[in-house]
Amino acid sequence: MIARLRIAAAIALSVTAVAIGGAFAQSSTVDEIAKYREALQDGNPAELWEARGEEMWTTPRGPKRVSFATCDLGLGPGVVKGAYAALPRYFADAKSVMDLETRLVWCMVNQQGISEGDATKIKFGDGSARRSDLEALAAYVTSQSRGVEMKVPVSEPHVRDMYRLGEQMFFYRGGTHDFSCATCHGEDGKRIRLQDLPNLTKTEGAQKAYTTWPAYRVSQGELRTFQWRLNDCFRQQRFPDLVFGSEASIALTTYLAGRANGAPYNGPAIKR
């Protein structure tokens, strides 16, 4: 009997300790995850994608044997320094607002002579030998804006219209779960498991989130672009697949990129 009472007392004390420490444990775990990510930054595998993307940028490709030196990302043909920090933007030659990936595809098709099907055949790598040229190019181009202030030209009429459409989409509820982007990213203090969910309706949250994509995902062994991030959000909301390079994807990207204006770009980053 005494032995049983001792066991019961020990269990009661353990439960009490868990109850008292639970609030601290969650906070502590989040802090440790942040430290883990910070420690990994010095050896970010995204650099491998950046190196491959740089080689692709300077190498003549496609039927026309042309390099990306002729590709204008908004600051002049071949200029990559700071270009990503001002995307999406309106391109008169394409008569549309484009983000980085859609502009890269446009240059492949119109300047290098690559078919759109081949240019977009592998949009995202799968963690094996199936590698995406777009992800590598995006890694290189975005790395050249590291430390540059975000300045998406949201006052330009075409970009402004796309921004407003993206804002409407951000708050639009639908799908089998009646979710919107704001369901997960419209309030402070939300998380999925141990993952903090930034409040993208606030400037600080939007800046912190957008400026760290593309990112190397440790759990997947792949560099992921912002287009991939949007696709994965749609999947989790049980929405239909987001069409690559569609007006919907450009609109959402424009809205979120515009909300990040004023912050220094800090990617490609590393995430869980």
Label each region the model flagged:
Residues M1-I11:
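Bacterial N-terminal signal peptides that target proteins for export
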Residues L137-Q144, P153-V154:
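Hydrophobic, well-structured mid-protein blocks that either form specific transmembrane helices
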Residues E38-E55, V148-E167:
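Short, charged low-complexity linear segments at domain edges
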Residues V15-F24:
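C-terminal segment of classical bacterial N-terminal signal peptides
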Residues E135, A139, R160, R164-Q168, ...:
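Internal, well-ordered alpha-helical scaffold/interface segments
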Residues A8, S155-E156, P268-R272:
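Short alpha-helical "patches" and their helix-cap loops
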